[in-house]
Curated annotation (Swiss-Prot):
Its EC number is 4.1.1.39. The active site is at K165, H284. The record marks K324 as: Transition state stabilizer. It is an enzyme of class 4 (lyase). The modification N6,N6,N6-trimethyllysine is found at K4. This is Ribulose bisphosphate carboxylase large chain. Its cofactor is Mg(2+). PANTHER family: RIBULOSE BISPHOSPHATE CARBOXYLASE, RIBULOSE BISPHOSPHATE CARBOXYLASE LARGE CHAIN. Coiled coil: none annotated. GO terms for biological process: photorespiration; reductive pentose-phosphate cycle. The gene is rbcL. The modification N6-carboxylysine is found at K191.
Amino acid sequence: VGFKAGVKDYKLTYYTPEYETKDTDILAAFRVTPQPGVPPEEAGAAVAAESSTGTWTTVWTDGLTSLDRYKGRCYHIEPVAGEENQYIAYVAYPLDLFEEGSVTNMFTSIVGNVFGFKALRALRLEDLRIPVAYVKTFQGPPHGIQVERDKLNKYGRPLLGCTIKPKLGLSAKNYGRAVYECLRGGLDFTKDDENVNSQPFMRWRDRFLFCAEAIYKSQAETGEIKGHYLNATAGTCEEMMKRAIFARELGVPIVMHDYLTGGFTANTSLAHYCRDNGLLLHIHRAMHAVIDRQKNHGIHFRVLAKALRMSGGDHIHAGTVVGKLEGERDITLGFVDLLRDDFIEKDRSRGIYFTQDWVSLPGVLPVASGGIHVWHMPALTEIFGDDSVLQFGGGTLGHPWGNAPGAVANRVALEACVQARNEGRDLAREGNEIIREACKWSPELAAACE
């Protein structure tokens, strides 16, 4: 046969429109913007090749393996409606290309190399279909939605949280006091800001101690289970684990991690520890906009959210929907369902390119956080439903009477909305009225609404 060296078009090997996808394949939907003069088939095939077995030229060692068994295949290409020179390229990867239980390896393979590719002007990973066979190699969230409700003994409503502000500069003692006031007022959780790690003005161990004190004091006074997301993110994995272990020794219910800056390897280790030791894990998505903000390049957040469900986390920040554009609402709800449900049907109107079956992987609670206020409560309750965490930072701490009354205002607004919904009222239409009625018997809420 003889070995034939030389450069040949990717599409001869990697563009296979007749390919029938297997149940075990990992499927990817890429938004491809080819350079001028590059046909879309070649661009799609180039992505499939470079993210699997291909390189820029035919190599002698190709003969020592079965390319047909291991190569990625671009099996379908469609133009993006309303965009010039943009295509969705669907790529199927054989399962054997990936290490079991490693989100890190999955991303290194699929997005590690292709994004700097010359033939492409831009590239965005829009969605992934994770096959059941691969899902089963992951532990996933340490506990999941149902176990969390049982641990906290809170049912039939969204959970309430608050990020402690000012995020940097408070001493540990004052920080603990702010935590206590919010929890005492009626919140379920308070939160370390994502950039609170262990800085000179507040070392992590001091913060953990004072926050634990705040938790136990507020629990004793309210008769409710309380928590504070203690941020265990650190410069090394060993230090991160040390912080998580200390949190467990204090007996607190939940810790926190920045999963993109901390990295998937660290996150998965922490998630395993949390399941083994009964800690809930709150995940913050700091740095996500660097990756997901551009419409034509990067990775869509729904992929990062799927990856987090595999790596492990019980809560993850997922945007707020409120006050944003209408179109974003459906897209956001699409990945909120991807986080919570066992089975999600393909639905392009919500940005879901593939049907995803999570089998028995626990669900993740979406966290709505950022610029929300008591007036948003009816909309948030309606949009996110019971299985969510609503976080009001400035919306709690910005109350004219202080933190505890701010917490009271949020809790009253939430309970009023849940009750109204259970009585069959339409939160979307009557939301403002429901809040106004509640103001009559809650001076704290009335003050917050002024």
